């Protein structure tokens, strides 16, 4: 696909698609609750559609009509054995969280995904689930998909310290803990996105959170709810960066989720000197309007507890750093290696091919700016965030063309991305 290049300004206002993390969880909680759940503004990207289809295959009635998802919940013990293997597509969130959901089901399932998902290690989830009494295994010692799982009605509660900062592992164990008899304690390495905790309370569940320690008493019953999904800050991140680095630009992003566990990119933008304004804050929905303008940027250091708050935004932050004066160091981000691609290497290769100066490290990158970008051919390798990062980088290219291979990967999280880009170019 040939990308738009040499754009002189971006202007306009858009609403980004619904938050992917919250969309996944709304389907899961709605399915496990008793009664009806209605979900508004859900993301209809491929990952979320995979989760929706999996729960249909598990016997849940889910209707998508007039822009509203209606779920007839079956309760914690109401899932049915599927007739076929469960297809998780490209979604690591789906396979990991649903492994926890099925921990208490007394039937056997196989879960598989596409080529990219089949390379992602699942041992971080399978090891603690085995301690709870679940029979679960995959391929090689890292338990790569496909996974075979047989749950148990006699789940044991667990006391588990996460060896890595992972909201997916934490959430999988919380879903399992809801079905175990007794108190499970999950201790995080660093605080990660807390959508599962928030939604558990919304659906009538109980838990206690003490800093990095989460306690869930099982078993529990959940009750169907109305869920309004805010815009995804991970999708908004591409426009935040575009507005900062494309000259003569001003972008307004409406209804963006600003849950405090997800706003690391805002902290980074401010540390780099970017012009960003937050208005129309809704404390209940945890959403706001974000406005950015073209800015002179300076390098910064990104690491530690900040990383889980922006792990998915690091590819586009790397592009931002190429347009800042000085050096930006990203560290403590080895988790990037086991995303849809090895994002440390793939980001560096993609942007370096366009003229950036990025040195990959064991746990991040060293980025020297400011770089003039030029044309190149870039492959997403099936990674949606690499595709969108490249499309934003291309806007700065004055010399040559930018070709993007496997651009369809962007549909994973942002099917309307190129439509929104066109509207901002002509705004």
Curated annotation (Swiss-Prot):
Active site, renumbered: 312 (proton acceptor)
Keyword Cell wall biogenesis/degradation annotated: no
Catalytic activity, as annotated: 3-phosphoshikimate + phosphoenolpyruvate = 5-O-(1-carboxyvinyl)-3-phosphoshikimate + phosphate
Binding residues for phosphoenolpyruvate: 20, 92, 120, 168, 343, 385
GO-annotated molecular function: 3-phosphoshikimate 1-carboxyvinyltransferase activity
GO CC annotation: cytoplasm
Biochemical pathway: Metabolic intermediate biosynthesis; chorismate biosynthesis; chorismate from D-erythrose 4-phosphate and phosphoenolpyruvate: step 6/7
E.C. code: 2.5.1.19
HAMAP family registered for this protein in UniProt: EPSP_synth (MF_00210)
Entry protein name: 3-phosphoshikimate 1-carboxyvinyltransferase
Protein source organism: Streptococcus pneumoniae (strain Hungary19A-6)
Gene: aroA
């Amino acid at each position: 696909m040939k990308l738009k290049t040499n754009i002189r300004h971006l202007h306009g206002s858009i609403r980004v698609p619904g938050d992917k993390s919250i969309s996944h969880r709304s389907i899961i909680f709605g399915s496990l609750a008793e009664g009806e759940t209605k979900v508004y503004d859900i993301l209809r990207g491929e990952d979320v559609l995979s989760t929706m289809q999996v729960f249909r295959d598990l016997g849940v009635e889910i209707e998508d009509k007039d822009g509203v998802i209606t779920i007839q919940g079956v309760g914690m013990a109401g899932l049915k054995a599927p007739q076929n293997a469960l297809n998780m597509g490209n979604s690591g969130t789906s396979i990991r969280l649903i492994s926890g959901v099925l921990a208490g089901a007394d039937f056997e399932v196989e879960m598989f995904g596409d080529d990219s998902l089949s390379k992602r290690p699942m041992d971080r989830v399978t090891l603690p689930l085995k301690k709870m009494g679940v029979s679960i295994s995959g391929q090689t010692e890292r338990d790569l998909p496909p996974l075979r799982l047989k749950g148990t009605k006699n789940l044991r509660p667990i006391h588990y310290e996460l060896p890595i900062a992972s909201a997916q592992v934490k959430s999988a164990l919380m879903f399992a803990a809801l079905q175990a008899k007794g108190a499970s304690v999950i201790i995080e390495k660093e605080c990660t996105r807390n959508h599962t905790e928030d939604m558990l309370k919304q659906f009538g569940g109980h838990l206690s959170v003490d800093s990095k320690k989460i306690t869930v008493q099982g078993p529990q019953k959940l009750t169907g709810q109305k869920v309004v999904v805010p815009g995804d800050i991970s999708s908004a991140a591409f426009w935040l960066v575009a507005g900062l680095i494309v000259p003569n630009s001003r972008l307004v992003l409406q209804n963006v989720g600003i849950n405090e566990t997800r706003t690391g990119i805002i902290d980074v933008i401010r540390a780099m000197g970017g012009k960003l304004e937050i208005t129309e804050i809704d404390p209940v929905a945890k959403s706001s309007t974000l406005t950015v303008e073209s800015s002179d940027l300076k390098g910064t250091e990104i690491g530690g507890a900040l990383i889980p708050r922006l792990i998915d935004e690091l590819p586009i932050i790397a592009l931002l750093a190429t347009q800042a004066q000085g050096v930006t160091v990203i560290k403590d981000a080895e988790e990037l290696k086991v995303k849809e691609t090895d994002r440390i290497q793939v980001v560096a290769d993609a942007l370096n091919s366009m003229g950036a100066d990025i040195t990959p490290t064991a746990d991040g990158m060293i980025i020297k700016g400011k770089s003039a970008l030029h044309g190149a051919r870039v492959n997403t390798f099936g990674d949606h965030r690499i595709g969108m990062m490249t499309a934003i980088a291309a806007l700065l290219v004055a010399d040559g063309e930018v070709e993007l291979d496997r651009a369809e990967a962007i549909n994973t999280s942002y099917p309307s991305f190129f439509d929104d880009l066109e509207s901002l170019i002509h705004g």
